[in-house]
A protein has these predicted regions:
Chain B
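Thiamine diphosphate
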Residues: 1-169, 173, 308, ...
Length: 386, 326
């Protein structure tokens, strides 16, 4: 024990440098499940083996490249004023594609607002994700078509929806599973704690997939927790595992295993994907104000796409033609996204009164009629002006 | 026999039993709703008859109760959740307001959220802090929610059926101090629409509008005023969102005077909304400004002071006199 820590122990109530939240706890050296190293080497893990064909590996690579391309296009569209806001997933492609490709069609996904890669895996047209960021709707897709729920902006709320949905799955006697996505910041929310309690108590078939991207806007993970996040699960009575979130193979293997556990009726699992948000939280913030340049540089060396490319090239699972073709496909996606967003019409004014209620509502009827009359008064005065 | 005299508590219990019996997708969730039957025994015996999978005792976490109910509704269930007391709904307020109320609209109508949130509300039972509040305006203000409150056993029975059948989320405020009041319930009747206000006493000099626990007080006030030769009409609003303004308007245009009575604080309360709308609709029919009687802009007081805070017969009659004096 050091002199400093002894002194701190004598004055437990005094704030000292040792107890400051700015000091990194032991979580900075995570025990990660890893199957593909940052250098692109395949490694084995005793609990999570995976055997993918060259075609499957290329498909994962394609997913990640196209997702990144889509994300880059959306960021550019925000800069051009076509979107009001964008939450970039840059750097988190492996966590999202790996977990997303572990899902079956009949599984149900509850995302936060950054799961563009998971949406891609579910078959949601990426342009559908842009309506809410452009300001033409608050969701815009039917969650039941792809079993992909609407984005949830209030942090952590969706973990409870996922838990309730999973309770319903169990009641139905179905063997599908549910996955809830959230971030390291959300782990501080009461709803996440309550969802852990409920899912454990009812043994709900839900996987909690926490993308620890190290930052909740400007607050580091150390501002959310003093223990590694995956260890929280133990206190609730279910397993937690930390996976290299930049390793698409490990994310796939770990999520698949957790989903299978849920299907077998063994209850929830917390997966902490240890990753990094390369860009800003959203296009509204400026990460240069709160994090050091060398931090990003260190994570760039762990880039999820580069490492799989290295492996594909070294193993001979993909040739140059594959990468060239993907580049063309990627540009075409960018072009389509651009065109669709720019052509998105503003909603009709009268749509204000649509969908507030499933059943009729006299108050809405009254206000709709007043608004319609008000709108019509402009048409009348235009008529008079002729 | 279809007509039976029962308490509001019994009517709610019978109604929940009927809902569980008719639709296998109906669930009841909450703290202590199982073996205990709820702290007010509204769910008494239901777990015994329908099992722990249908009548679900939950962890002690209100946001979790409503949040998981939302998930169950998305899976096709129709959860009825019990919040133990009015003041305990606030941990769940976020889930109700930011999630439950808005999800149907956010999905452009593609999904439905048939969740009923039962809240025993209001004062007059000598309870401790957070057990006597009337937060209905906080919910009525939120688009996407329906807010209702029965005042008698028949409405308790039928409005609960209608709330469960609604594809929209319904906040169902139960007047806890009237739980043991008895009246006739016809379980074979064809109920009126959920959001229709009802004239519970005819009159020609002034209209009293109330809902939930205050209907009884207003009926007593009208009876007392009758002895002084004043003819008071009493409306039971039944629904605070939406509000049946047509019925209120028709009554006011007959009597020319309106007093709104509720337990909740007057400031920003439902009385303010009714006064404003009726003034817009019936300005030239009004013989007096619309008056309001309700709680004060003060924390709900300790039990020994609640008689001063809650509108009673005298305060309602005082408002009637003030209105008639114009």
């Amino acid at each position: 024990m050091t002199v400093e820590s002894t002194a701190a122990a004598r004055k437990p109530r005094r704030a000292s440098k040792r107890t400051s939240a700015a000091k990194k706890p032991q979580s900075s050296e995570p025990q990660l499940v890893q199957l593909l190293t940052p250098e692109g080497e395949r490694v084995e893990h005793p609990d999570y083996s995976i055997d993918l064909s060259a075609e499957e590996l290329r498909a994962l690579y394609r997913d990640m490249v196209l997702t990144r391309r889509f994300d880059a296009e959306a960021t550019a569209l925000q800069r051009q004023g076509e979107l009001g806001l964008w939450a970039s997933l840059l750097g988190q492609e492996a966590a999202q594609i790996g977990s997303g490709r572990a899902l079956r069609d009949d599984d149900y996904v509850f995302p936060t607002y950054r799961e563009h890669g998971v949406a891609w895996c579910r078959g949601v047209d990426p342009t559908n994700l842009l309506g809410m960021f452009r300001g033409v709707n608050h969701g815009g897709w039917d969650p039941t078509t792809n079993n992909f729920h609407l984005y949830t902006i209030v942090i952590g709320s969706q973990t409870l929806h996922a838990t309730g949905y999973a309770m319903g799955v169990a009641k139905d006697g179905a063997d599908s599973a549910v996955i809830a996505y959230f971030g390291d910041g959300a782990s501080s929310q009461g709803d996440v704690a309550e969802s852990f309690t409920f899912s454990a108590v009812y043994n709900a078939p839900v996987v909690f997939f926490c993308q620890n991207n190290q930052w909740a806007i400007s607050e580091p993970t150390e501002r959310q927790t003093r223990v590694p996040l995956y260890q929280r699960a133990q206190g609730y009575g279910f397993p937690g595992v930390r996976v290299d979130g930049n390793d698409v193979l490990a994310c796939l293997a770990v999520t698949r295993s957790a989903l299978e556990r849920a299907r077998r009726g063994e209850g929830p699992t917390l997966v902490e994907a240890f990753t990094y948000r390369m860009g800003a939280h959203t296009t509204s913030d400026d990460p240069t104000k709160y994090r050091a340049d060398d931090e990003r540089a260190a994570w760039e060396a762990k880039d999820p796409i580069l490492r799989l490319r290295t492996y594909l090239e070294k193993s001979g699972h993909a040739d140059e033609a594959f990468f060239t073709e993907l580049e063309t496909e990627s540009e075409a996606l960018g072009k389509r996204v651009r065109e669709v967003v720019r052509a998105m019409p503003d909603p009709e004014p009268m749509s204000l009164f649509e969908h507030g209620y499933a059943d009729g509502n006299s108050l809405v009827d009254e206000e709709r009629a007043q608004f319609a009359a008000y709108q019509a008064s402009f048409a009348d005065s235009a008529e008079e002006g002729k | 026999m279809a007509v039976e005299k029962m308490s509001i508590a019994k009517a709610l219990n019978e109604s929940l039993r009927h809902a569980l019996d008719t639709d296998p997708k109906v669930l009841i969730m909450g703290e202590d709703v199982g073996k205990l039957g709820g702290v007010f025994r509204i769910t008494d015996g239901l777990q015994k008859d329908f099992g722990e999978d249908r009548v679900i005792d939950t962890p002690l976490a209100e946001s979790g109760i409503v949040g998981t109910a939302i998930g169950l509704a998305l899976r096709g269930y129709r959860p009825i959740v019990e919040i133990q007391f009015d003041g305990f709904v606030f941990p769940a307020y976020d889930q109700i307001v930011t999630q439950l109320a808005k999800m149907h609209a956010r999905a452009l109508g593609k999904i439905k959220l048939p969740v009923v949130v039962r809240i025993p509300y209001g004062g007059g039972i000598g309870a401790v802090e957070h057990h006597s509040e009337s937060p209905e305006a906080l919910f009525a203000h939120v688009a996407g929610l329906k807010v209702v409150s029965p005042s008698n056993a028949s409405d308790a029975y039928w409005m609960m059926q209608q709330a469960v059948q609604s594809d929209d989320p319904v906040i169902f405020f139960e007047p806890k101090r009237r739980y043991w009041d008895k009246s006739e319930v016809d379980t074979d009747a064809i109920p009126g629409p959920l959001h229709k206000a009802v004239t519970v006493r005819e009159g020609s000099d002034l209209t009293l509008v109330a809902y939930g626990p205050m209907v009884k007080v207003c009926l007593e006030a009208a009876a007392a005023a009758q002895e002084e030769g004043k003819s008071i009409e009493v409306l039971d609003l039944r629904s605070m969102s939406p509000i049946d303004f047509d019925t209120v308007q028709a009554s006011v245009e007959k009597t020319g005077r309106l007093v709104v009575v509720h337990e909740a604080p007057v400031f920003y309360g439902s009385g303010a909304e009714i006064a404003a709308r009726i003034t817009e609709r019936s300005f030239y029919h009004l013989e007096a400004p619309v008056l309001r009687v309700g709680g004060y802009h003060a924390p709900y007081p300790p039990a020994r002071l609640e008689e001063e805070y809650l509108p009673g017969l005298d305060r309602v009659l005082d408002a009637v006199d003030r209105s008639l004096a114009y």
